[in-house]
C-alpha cells in the first residue's frame, strides 16, 4: 500500500519539472474553473504542482484554502494516480466555490484523468512476443 503522505518527492518543485508538463502533456482535463495537465513520469508515485495566481484567485485566504483542498484530494487519490506528473491550474471563480463542491469537482477530475490515460501494454500482451511455446 502506498503511503498517503505528501512529502517533498510527491511535489513538482523546479521550473524544469513544471515545464516538462506544460510543454508536452499526455493528459489534459478541463474542469469548471480549473485545468489539469498531466504527463507520465516513469516513477512509482505521482507528483503534484499547483498554479494558483493572484490574478485568478484574489484573496490569499482563498488561494491557501484551494491549495489545502487540492493537496488533500490528491493525497487520497495518489494510489490510482501513480506514474503521473500533474499540474493543476486555477482559473477565475475557483475561489468562490464551496468546499463540498470543490471536493466533488477534484474527484471527478482525477477519474477523468484516469479514464483518458493511454493504455500501456505489458510485454506479455504485446503482439509478436512469444508466450513460451514454440511452433
UniProtKB/Swiss-Prot annotation:
Instruction: Give the EC number(s) listed in the UniProt record.
Output: 3.1.26.5
State the GO CC annotations.
Answer: ribonuclease P complex
Asked if the Swiss-Prot or TrEMBL record annotates the protein with the keyword Cell membrane, the reply is: no
Please give a single GO biological process term from the UniProt record.
tRNA 5'-leader removal
Reactions catalysed: Endonucleolytic cleavage of RNA, removing 5'-extranucleotides from tRNA precursor
Annotated keywords? Endonuclease, Hydrolase, Nuclease, RNA-binding, tRNA processing
Does the keyword Metal-binding belong to this entry?
no
Recall the GO molecular function terms of this protein's record: 3'-tRNA processing endoribonuclease activity; ribonuclease P activity; tRNA binding
User: Which PANTHER family does the record cross-reference, listed alphabetically?
Assistant: RIBONUCLEASE P PROTEIN COMPONENT
Family according to the record: Belongs to the RnpA family.
Function field: RNaseP catalyzes the removal of the 5'-leader sequence from pre-tRNA to produce the mature 5'-terminus. It can also cleave other RNA substrates such as 4.5S RNA. The protein component plays an auxiliary but essential role in vivo by binding to the 5'-leader sequence and broadening the substrate specificity of the ribozyme.
The UniProt subunit note reads as follows: Consists of a catalytic RNA component (M1 or rnpB) and a protein subunit.
> Protein name, please?
Ribonuclease P protein component
Q: Which organism is it from?
A: Pseudomonas paraeruginosa (strain DSM 24068 / PA7) (Pseudomonas aeruginosa (strain PA7))
Amino acid at each position: 500500500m502506498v503511503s498517503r503522505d505528501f512529502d517533498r518527492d510527491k511535489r513538482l518543485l523546479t521550473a524544469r519539472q513544471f515545464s516538462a508538463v506544460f510543454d508536452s502533456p499526455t493528459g489534459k482535463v478541463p474542469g469548471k474553473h480549473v485545468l489539469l495537465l498531466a504527463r507520465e513520469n516513469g516513477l512509482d508515485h505521482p507528483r503534484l504542482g499547483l498554479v494558483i495566481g493572484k490574478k485568478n484567485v484574489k484573496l490569499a485566504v482563498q488561494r491557501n484554502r484551494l491549495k489545502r483542498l487540492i493537496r488533500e484530494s490528491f493525497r487520497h487519490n495518489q494510489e490510482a494516480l501513480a506514474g503521473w506528473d500533474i499540474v493543476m491550474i486555477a482559473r477565475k471563480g475557483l475561489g468562490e466555490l464551496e468546499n463540498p463542491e470543490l471536493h466533488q469537482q477534484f474527484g471527478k477530475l482525477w477519474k477523468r484523468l484516469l479514464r483518458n490515460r493511454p493504455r500501456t501494454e505489458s510485454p506479455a500482451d504485446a503482439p509478436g512476443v512469444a508466450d513460451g511455446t514454440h511452433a
